[in-house]
Amino acid sequence: MNKFERHTKAIDYALSKIKESPLSKFVKEVVLFGSVARNEERYDSDIDLLLVLDEQARAYKRDILNLRGNISSDELADAEADLKITFNENWRDSMDTIFLCIKKDGIKIA
């Protein structure tokens, strides 16, 4: 499996886990960022995802923790996924370094 297939498979898996989650009704957007979004990934790179949820999802802490823990496939050949979660779309106004990078390089995938 080449790096493109590896990362595509990991993204598809993560998106399926998000859609299966009780949080799916609160999803505002999913943004791919990091080396994969910049086309600078290596074979061993992980995928970085920002999950933007509606404020109401804050009440679903257990589901949030469960999703974070299950966002990557158990298959050793698959890339790992790193999931960042934020609420509402105020992240776009943030001056935090991570959000500045996401605004610059991020690709909305859902």
Regions found by a protein language model. Name each.
Residues S45-I47:
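Short, conserved active-site loops that position catalytic residues or coordinate cofactors/metal ions
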Residues L49-L51:
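Short beta-strand->loop micro-motif that forms the acidic, two-metal-ion catalytic signature
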Residues M1-E29, A37-Y43, D54-A110:
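Catalytic core of pol beta-like nucleotidyltransferases
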